[in-house]
């Protein structure tokens, strides 16, 4: 395929135009009066959302040069979502403003490398000031405030998340799922989460969120590494006949075995996800046994005379109501009404408590306490309902955003919301030292860019940006901000309008990182447009027209 190359000013112009297209679509969602975006789906009704990263990821521009710019800012939103779980719209708005201002300096003939150095110093100083003015989350009400703001002012969502955290602890496991009715409920069930994710991203069932979600799966627990597929065949065929998915937790899965599982998963012969077992050595064996008790299964281990190739039915497999696997974590949710499992879990907890009493090692005691907490605290499930499927999905998105923001707040604290944390932090730049005038230009660019979130929130609320910015510039109270919901100036902390420090910090860092890359780019290589309209137009099917029944599994 032939390529086209664009250089210099024309290159940056196209990239900036692409960034601006995405930023305009994402920016309208910011703040309490931000608007929703309707995203066409390949099937079913459109997705209605105010989630910045969902909007960004849905954008694919026809013009390939513009699309390069779009992908730059989509990467900002994605990275911020991965690290902080929220703040994607703020990051996008800042990145757009930073790229435009840095480009003006470049066009004016200023040494862009020195400008970048000055801007980098400014970003570091602002982040230090934001951290300095951060306050820890002290109580349930503050957790509710963070969740309320992040869910677009939905107080019910804020209170439900605060209630869930109260029941399972601030570091407890909370999941979000669809309710079977109109209601929004919190339910605490038996379950656990451990710090191991899927072995390959090809196991992800939700490509947008890159997670695997299984309802009522079987769980195969192996105290061994699996490299060849043959020992797995009997149990895989037994599970395939039931039509249920399989979660395979083992020391490791690689080679032929991993390839076969991925192939059959993609083919649809069996829904499966492979996960590495948590822990190491003897602790790994104990944690596998914990999972076995929770799921009413058995650990397949040759130490007990159980060989994998002899497992040809589902009798030794565990079960769960739901399993969610990300690249980093696995969460198992079980039915709290199963009295047999309840008794076994309570007995196991008692064994762990006795072990805690007997150990003299602080490290061992800490690890035992972690295991006890995983078994004892359970999982809080936020069940989100709605009058229609579209309404339910939109609300579920807001609940997930609010949950991410709340976790970020617990981790690093909170700052005044509404964009004022960055706005007031920019004042430290007035006394920031610089090596030359070009660096001062970079510092001033960041100072101007930090107005962008406030301006976007005011704009979305139908207010006058310059008037609000001018009013806040006079304020000596760093908590004073503009409440876009009431169109009044208020003490943001007292009004409960707060942002997680981690979200604010990450948004600025990621936005500047991408803006720096864009401004350092002087050439762009893309496919020729006409090449996309050529190619094989034959009507033949893929793979030689194989049409079997289910076709069995590929081993």
Swiss-Prot record:
The protein's name: Chaperonin GroEL
Any Gene Ontology CC annotation: cytoplasm
Where ATP binds, per the record, is at 29-32, 50, 86-90, 418, 499
Q: What is its EC number?
A: 5.6.1.7
Coiled coil location: none
State the organism of origin: Orientia tsutsugamushi
Q: Which reactions is this enzyme annotated as catalysing?
A: ATP + H2O + a folded polypeptide = ADP + phosphate + an unfolded polypeptide
Q: List all Gly residues biased stretches.
A: 537-555
The annotated subunit structure for this chain is: Forms a cylinder of 14 subunits composed of two heptameric rings stacked back-to-back. Interacts with the co-chaperonin GroES.
What are the subcellular locations of this protein? Cytoplasm
Q: Give the UniProt family note.
A: Belongs to the chaperonin (HSP60) family.
**Intrachain S-S bonds:** none
Question: What biological processes does GO assign it?
Answer: protein refolding
Show the Gene3D superfamilies listed in the entry. Answer: GroEL (3.50.7.10), GroEL-like equatorial domain (1.10.560.10), TCP-1-like chaperonin intermediate domain (3.30.260.10)
């Amino acid at each position: 395929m032939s390529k086209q190359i664009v250089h210099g000013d024309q290159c940056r112009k196209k990239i900036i135009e692409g960034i601006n297209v995405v930023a305009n679509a994402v920016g309208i969602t910011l703040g309490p009066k931000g608007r929703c975006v309707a995203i066409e789906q390949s099937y079913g009704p459109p997705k209605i959302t105010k989630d910045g990263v969902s909007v960004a990821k849905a954008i694919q521009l026809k013009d390939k040069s513009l699309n390069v710019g779009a992908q730059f800012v989509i990467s900002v939103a994605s990275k911020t979502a991965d690290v902080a779980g929220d703040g994607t719209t703020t990051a996008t708005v800042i990145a757009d403003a930073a790229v435009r201002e840095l480009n003006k300096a470049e066009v004016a003939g200023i040494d862009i490398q020195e400008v970048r150095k000055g801007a980098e110093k400014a970003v570091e100083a602002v982040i230090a000031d934001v951290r300095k003015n951060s306050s820890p989350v002290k109580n349930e009400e503050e957790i509710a405030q963070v969740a309320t703001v992040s869910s677009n002012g939905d107080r019910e969502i804020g209170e439900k998340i605060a209630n869930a955290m109260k029941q399972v602890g601030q570091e407890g496991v909370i999941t979000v799922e669809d309710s079977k009715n109109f209601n929004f409920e919190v339910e605490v069930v038996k379950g656990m989460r451990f710090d191991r994710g899927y072995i390959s991203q090809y196991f992800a069932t939700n490509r947008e969120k890159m997670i695997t979600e299984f309802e009522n799966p079987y769980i195969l627990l192996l105290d061994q590494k699996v490299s060849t597929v043959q020992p797995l065949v009997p149990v895989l065929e037994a599970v395939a006949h039931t039509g249920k998915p399989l979660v395979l937790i083992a020391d490791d899965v690689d080679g032929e075995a991993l390839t076969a599982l991925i192939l059959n998963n993609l083919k649809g012969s069996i829904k499966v996800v492979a996960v590495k077992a948590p822990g190491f050595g003897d602790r790994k064996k104990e944690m596998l046994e914990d999972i076995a008790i929770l799921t009413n299964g058995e650990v397949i281990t040759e130490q007990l005379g159980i060989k994998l190739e002899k497992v040809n039915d589902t009798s030794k497999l565990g079960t769960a109501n739901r399993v969610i696997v990300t690249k980093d974590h696995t969460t198992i949710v079980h039915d709290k009404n199963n009295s047999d499992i309840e008794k076994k879990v309570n007995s196991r907890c008692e064994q762990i408590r006795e072990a805690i009493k007997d150990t003299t090692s602080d490290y061992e005691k800490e690890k035992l306490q972690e295991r006890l907490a995983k078994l004892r605290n359970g999982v809080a499930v936020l069940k989100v309902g709605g009058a229609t499927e579209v309404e339910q999905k939109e609300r579920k998105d807001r609940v997930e955003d609010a949950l991410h923001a709340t976790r970020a707040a617990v981790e690093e604290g909170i700052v005044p919301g509404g964009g004022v944390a960055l706005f007031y932090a920019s004042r430290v730049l007035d006394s920031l030292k610089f090596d030359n005038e070009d660096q001062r230009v970079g510092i001033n660019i960041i100072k101007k860019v930090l107005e962008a979130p406030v301006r976007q929130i005011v704009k979305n609320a139908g207010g006058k940006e310059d008037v609000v910015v001018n009013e806040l510039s006079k304020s000596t109270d760093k908590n004073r901000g503009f409440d876009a919901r009431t169109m009044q100036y208020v003490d943001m902390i007292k009004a409960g309008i707060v942002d997680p420090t981690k979200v604010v910090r990450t948004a600025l860092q990621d936005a500047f990182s991408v803006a720096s890359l864009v401004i350092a780019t002087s050439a762009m290589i893309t496919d020729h447009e006409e090449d996309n309209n050529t190619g094989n137009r034959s009507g033949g099917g893929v793979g030689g027209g194989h049409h079997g029944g289910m076709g069995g599994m590929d081993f």
